[in-house]
Amino acid sequence: LGDVYKRQHRESTLDAVADIDDESANNLAAQFGAIVKSADEIISDPNIDAILIATSTDTHSDFIEKASSAFKAILCEKPVDLSLVRAKECLDKVNAAKNPIMIGFNRRFDPNFAQLKKSLDNGEIGNRELLTITSFDPAPPPISYVKTSGGLYRDMMIHDFDLSNFIMGELPISLSAVGHSLVDPAIGVAGDVDTAVVTMSYADGKIAVIKNSRRAAYGYDQRIEILGSEGLLQAENILENSVLKSYYDVVISSKPIYFFLELYIGSFKAEWDAFLKSVRNHKPVPVTLKDGVAALAMAEAATQSQNTGKSIQLKELL
């Protein structure tokens, strides 16, 4: 993902790269005239202003703390950590820090989702009442990935937890989850689910529903629908092309875009833009470390609900 961010922006200079894969580090550095260093060397370099953390999840909290101690601006990919306890500890340690710390929930910056949020905030459909987020991957990841991912709720649905907080403008009070392994039995053997639905309740009675699946045969399905007191807003799928074939007995459209980088490449650029703008103008970042911890707490609540069959109160985890 570090490569993706760099390719999407011309107003920042890539100075140094650290990667456990030497070949990847050298290739990226060569493309952009950077040098390869260790992570500690990068963090301690006084000439480096900002750090992008796109490492394995179990290293995120450690790198956030180290980079914060060095007063670097930080953009860290989601999630903050696989452990909610560790993520909260990280938040406590850097809470008083003055350096910007942003968590990379790129879907907030998708132009269609951002426009939906703007329309909501402008009051175009009145009060929020019922939110539905659909997120289906075209195919499941390798089992080797599943085993280290932290599970569907922490790895996949965490995007939608953050997106629901962004759209609703507040956290839910309780979550209920149902999940099963329907796509690949090996995912179940690995201790995870590949198909899940989470229902969330809010203090004033609003409801949100998130639907996830690791498989959608027709492509990458990413939709949002929100019902308000005065109307409905929908963000639909982006298709491979806009050609519509109409016949006497059927109308055929193209399938949704298949791969997440194809769909969300613009959101990564917009996210990096927002990060740089905050750093340059000394303004608060749009997605905080606290936001990241909240999304992780929701993932933990969903996991507990699935395992116990009970609704989980979010305040018990925050």
Feature-to-residue mapping (PLM):
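Short, small-residue-biased leader/transition segments that mark boundaries at the very start
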Residues: 1-5
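NAD(P)-binding Rossmann-fold cofactor-contacting core
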Residues: 9-28
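Beta-loop-alpha module in the N-terminal Rossmann-like domain of NAD(P)-dependent dehydrogenases
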Residues: 34-93
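Hydrophobic residues in well-ordered beta-strands that form the structural core
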Residues: 38, 76, 101-103, 132, ...
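C-terminal helix-rich "cap/oligomerization" subdomain common to oxidoreductases
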Residues: 50-53, 203, 274-318
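A contiguous active-site-proximal alpha/beta segment in oxidoreductase catalytic domains
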Residues: 58, 81-142
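Rossmann-like dinucleotide-binding domain that binds NAD(P)(H)
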Residues: 143-207, 213-218, 290
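NAD(P)-dinucleotide binding in Rossmann-like oxidoreductases
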Residues: 186-192, 203-270, 288
